[in-house]
Amino acid sequence: MAFKDTFNKMISYFDTDEVNEVEEDVAASTDNVIPRSQQSVRASSHPKQEPRNNHVQQDHQARSQEQTRSQMHPKHGTSERYYQQSQPKEGHEMVDRRKRMSTSSIANRREQYQQSTCSDQTTIALKYPRKYEDAQEIVDLLIVNECVLIDFQFMLDAQARRCLDFIDGASKVLYGSLQKVGSSMYLLAPSNVSVNIEEMTIPHTTQDIGFDFDMKRR
């Protein structure tokens, strides 16, 4: 009996050692497994965090780009509006300037034309001499380069002949011209006026043949 007990104790001792070794192996294996699992979890958690960070950065960049675009578009719009507003103003200003220039040029042309016409303008005076002294007034008009249409219907023959001779001599001295245009009418013109009269037959019912003009007799 004592021998069996000792033998059983020895067996149990060796059995406990094996069990302890097995337990130690199991514990070691579990220790090794736990860090690996933790490492795998950590390793798996890190890639998840990196894409999140990338998404956050992308969102931030997109927002910043949108903000810059939103800031740029109003400026572009305002510049377009300013250009559109300024362009019609410039067009109206150009039209107004052209109108002013055209009106001023027209006014200048009118003034120049009026001045030229005034300087070159020739007047025709119609005179009905009644006495010999009226001939001097007619010659004075010729001196200032005026045309004179003379009608001798209110003069007698002798007075009309004397007046006509005086006017004819003055016209030659002043390089004018005296032409008959009617039965009792003569045209006295200065040297700067040319008179072209068509040839026509003037009726000479009561004409004095010697002096070649018709006078009403009183």
Swiss-Prot record:
Residues 47-63 have a biased composition (Basic and acidic residues). Residues 29-43, 102-115 have a biased composition (Polar residues). The keyword Cytoplasm applies. Keywords: Cell cycle, Cell division, Cytoplasm, Septation. Its main location: cytoplasm. Signal peptide: none annotated. The keyword Cytoplasm applies. It is found in: Cytoplasm. It holds the Pfam family SepF. GO terms for biological process: division septum assembly; FtsZ-dependent cytokinesis. One of its GO terms (cellular component) is cytoplasm. Residues 25-115 are annotated as: Disordered. Belongs to the SepF family. Homodimer. Interacts with FtsZ. Cell division protein that is part of the divisome complex and is recruited early to the Z-ring. Probably stimulates Z-ring formation, perhaps through the cross-linking of FtsZ protofilaments. Its function overlaps with FtsA. This is Cell division protein SepF. The gene is sepF.
